[in-house]
Amino acid sequence: MFRATRCLRLPLRNSHINILRPTQTELIKTRSSALAPYEKVSPITAVGATPVGVGNGNYCYSTKTRQKHPLINTRNDLKKAQRVVVKLGSAVITREDECGLALGRLASIVEQVSELQQSGRQMLIVSSGAVAFGRQKLRQELVMSMSMRQTLRGPSGMTADKRACAASGMPGLMSLYEQLFQQYGITVAQVLLTKPDIDDDQRRKNLQATIESLLSLNIIPIVNANDAVAPDPKLNMHISDNDSLAARLSAEIEAELLIILSNVNGVYTGPPDLEGSRLLYTYVPSENSGVTFGANSKFGTGGMESKVTACVNALNNGVTTVITNGLAQDAITDAVAGKKIGTMFCNTKGYEGPPIEEVAEKCRDAGRQLAALSNKERGAMVRHLAALLVDKEKYIIEANQTDLANAKSAGLDPQLLNRLKMTPEKIQDLHAGLNTIADSAETLVGRVLKKVKISEGLFLEQVTVPIGSLMVIFESRPDCLPQVASLAMASGNALLLKGGKEAEESNKALHALVQEALGTHGFEMRDAVTLVRSREDVADLLQLKDLIDLIIPRGSSDLVRSMQEKSKGIPVLGHAEGVCHVYIDKDCDEQKAIQIVRDSKCDYPSACNAAETILIHKDLATAPFFDSLCSMFKAEGVKLHAGPKLAALLKFAPPPAESMSFEYGSLECTLEVVDNVEEAVAHIIRYGSGHTESIITENTNTAEHFLKHVDSACAFHNASTRFADGYRFGLGAEVGISTGRIHARGPVGVEGLLTTKWLLRGEGHLVEDFKNGKYSYLHENLNPSEVYRALDAAGELKKATA
C-alpha cells in the first residue's frame, strides 16, 4: 500500500475529455529493446507521481511539482527529454487529395510514440486531421443526397463547411487513434480546446491539471483545437493554428521537447524549392533573422512562418523545438535520439557551430586558393608539415597516449590498438614519406599530357588539374591523416577528413600541424584541410554533391559499403570487399607455391589484399603437395573451409564454407578444387570482388591466359597478393584501392587525385572558317615540350627554349 497526501481522480464525464482505454493495459510498460537508442527514464520519478492503493489492485496518483529542467541546447542532450510533445501537421497525416488520412504514415507515427512512451517518457500529441477525416464522411453524405442528374454531373464544386467536417471527423479520428495505440497496450485520451481554455486563467489551470493527471496515469493525451466551434483565426498567438497550440501547451506543461512534424525537412533560408535555399540544421533566433518564407501548405492553416514563430515562443518559455519532415522514416525517434535531422531551435549558448554546408563551402573555397599556388609553393607546404611532425613528436605521442588509454579501457581489439598507436618510428616514416610527396608535387598539377595542332595557329592541350573537393573517411589509424593531407596539399585539392572516434585526440593534434603548415609562407589556407568531428556531419556531407567531388573511405568493407549506399550522386573511390584468390596450377614450383600462399594469407590477414580463397588444380589435390599445404596452414594457425568440390573429393574434409565469396579478414580461408585454369578464371569472375588475383605456375602460356582473362584490378604471376599496395607499386603514399572501372583502378596514389581539362588556344578561329575552306583540320599530335611547357598551376605558359 502506498500513501500520499492527495489523490487526484480524473473527471471522466468532462465534456472536453474522453478517456480511451484498451481492455488490457499495463499501467507502466517498459520494453528493453525500445530503451537502446534513448536514455532510460524512470516513469514514476520522471512524472513526479506516487501510486496510492484504492482497492482491488487499482491505483490513482498524487501529483507533485516537477523540478525545473534546464533548457536543452545541444542535440546530444535531446535524449534526456522526459516530457515530449509531438505536433502532427495536416500535411503529414492527411492524404494528398485532402480527403481522409494516410493510414500507413499514421501507424508509423503511433509506433514511434508508443516506443518512446514505453521507454519511460511522457508523450503528448497535438493532432490535426479531424477536418480531413470528416470531409471524407461528409462527401459521401453529399453524394448520397444528390439527385441522379447531379450525380451524373460529377462531384465538382461539392464543398462542406470546415466546422461541420471537424465535428463529423473527431469521433472517427479518436477511434482510429484508440485502435492503433491499443496494439501497444497504451491508453489515450482526447482533449479538445477552444480559445477561452487558453486565455482564461482558471480554465488554463484546469487544463494543466487534467493533462498532468493523464500523464501521471501513463495515458497519452491527444490534443486538438475544437474546430467545430472555433472562431476565425486571430493575429495574436493563441490557438489560431495547431503550431501555436502545441507551443503554448508545451510551455504550460513544462515539456522539455516539442517536435513539429511537417512535410518539409525543416527551416530553409528561403522557400525550399528556390534555388540556393539551404536547410538550417540549427536556428538561433538572434542570428537567423534573414529567413524568407514561402506560401502556406494547402492542407493546414499554419505555414512555415507560423511554425517558426511558434518555435521561438516555445524556446522563450524554456521548450526546445525541432521541426522535421514527418514523411521520413523514424523521424520522431531519430529526433529524440539526437540525430541531425530537421531544424533545432536553441539559444546562442550551446550553439553547435556553423552548418556543415558552410564548413564544406569554406573548405572548397580555400582549396581553390591552394590550387592557384605554384607546384613549388605547395611542395614547400608539404615539406614544412614533414618537419613539424618531427619537431612536435612529443606533442603527438602525448595526445596518442590519451587515445590509447581510452581505447584500452573500452576494450578495443589488440589489433586495432596496434593500428592506433603512434611511435617515433612511425613518425620518422611519415617524415620520409611526406618529403617524397613534396618532391613529386613539383610536377603534378599543370602537366601537359597531350598536345594537338588542330590547325594553323590553333593548339589543343590536355593538362592535369585537381579533382576539387575530397572527403576521406578513415578508421583507427591516425598516421593516415598527415599522409592524406599531404597528398591533397600536393595535388591542390580541398580535403574534408573524418577519423575514427578512438583516435580523436591524435587526429586533433595532427590536424593542428596540418593547419599550421597551410598558414605558412604568407598564405592563409587553413580551411583547405578541415577535420569533421561528428558522424551526423558525415551523413550530411554525403548529400552535398555540389560541394564534394569524390569520397574516399579507408577502412573496413562495412565502411566502404556504407559510403557507397549513402552517397547521393558523389563518386566513391574504394572497394567494398577484398575477396582475393591464389590459383595453384599443376605446373607450379611447389616450394614457391607454399611460400607465396603463406605470405598472401598470413603476412597481414586483415588487409584487403590478403588471400581469402586458394584454388588448387585437381591433380594437386590428391598429391603429397596438398598435405604439405595443409601442414603449413596448420603451423600458421589458419582455419580452413572446404568448397563443395573439395568436400566431395575428401573423406574427411574441413568444415564447408558458408559462402564462396567471403572476406574473412582473419586467419581463415577457403580451399577449393578446379579442373584447369579456365575453371579457375570462371570461379574468380563469379565469386571474386575484382581486387587482386594471383596464379602460381611455371607454364608461361597458362600464366598469360590467367592474366588476360581475370577481370580484376590486379592480376599477378608467381607473386603474393600482398603486393597490391601503392607504396609497393612505387606510387608513394596510397590514397586507397579501387575496384571501380572509371577514373582510377587498383592501388591509387597521388595521380588518382588529379583529373584533366582541355585548353584550346587560337587566334580568332571560327568553325565557319573550316566550312568555307579558310582553314583545314590537321589534328597533328605534338610532343608538348616542342611548343609549350606548363610551368605552374596558375596556367602561365612560356615558349620552350631551343
Curated annotation (Swiss-Prot):
Q: Which Pfam families match?
A: AA_kinase, Aldedh
Catalysed reactions, semicolon-separated: L-glutamate + ATP = L-glutamyl 5-phosphate + ADP; L-glutamate 5-semialdehyde + phosphate + NADP(+) = L-glutamyl 5-phosphate + NADPH + H(+)
Please give the Gene3D superfamilies that the UniProt record associates with this protein: Acetylglutamate kinase-like (3.40.1160.10), Aldehyde Dehydrogenase, Chain A, domain 1 (3.40.605.10), Aldehyde Dehydrogenase, Chain A, domain 2 (3.40.309.10)
User: What are the binding positions for substrate in this chain?
Assistant: 128, 227, 242
Quote the record's binding site residues for ATP: 262-263, 301-307
Molecular functions (GO terms):
ATP binding; glutamate 5-kinase activity; glutamate-5-semialdehyde dehydrogenase activity
Which pathway does the record list? Amino-acid biosynthesis; L-proline biosynthesis; L-glutamate 5-semialdehyde from L-glutamate: step 1/2; Amino-acid biosynthesis; L-proline biosynthesis; L-glutamate 5-semialdehyde from L-glutamate: step 2/2
Chain intervals for the UniProt region annotation (Gamma-glutamyl phosphate reductase): 355-802
Query: Can you list the GO cellular component terms from the UniProt entry?
Result: mitochondrion
Q: What segment(s) does the record annotate as region Glutamate 5-kinase?
A: 1-354
User: PROSITE patterns recorded for this chain?
Assistant: GLUTAMATE_5_KINASE, PROA
Keyword list, A-Z: Amino-acid biosynthesis, ATP-binding, Kinase, Multifunctional enzyme, NADP, Nucleotide-binding, Oxidoreductase, Proline biosynthesis, Transferase
Q: Which GO terms describe its biological process?
A: L-proline biosynthetic process
**Coiled coil stretches, renumbered:** none
Similarity-based family: In the N-terminal section; belongs to the glutamate 5-kinase family.
Q: Which NCBIfam families does UniProt cross-reference here?
A: P5CS, PRK00197.1, proA, proB
Protein name per Swiss-Prot or TrEMBL: Probable delta-1-pyrroline-5-carboxylate synthase
Task: Give the taxonomic lineage as stored in the record.
Answer: Eukaryota, Metazoa, Ecdysozoa, Nematoda, Chromadorea
What gene is behind this protein?
alh-13
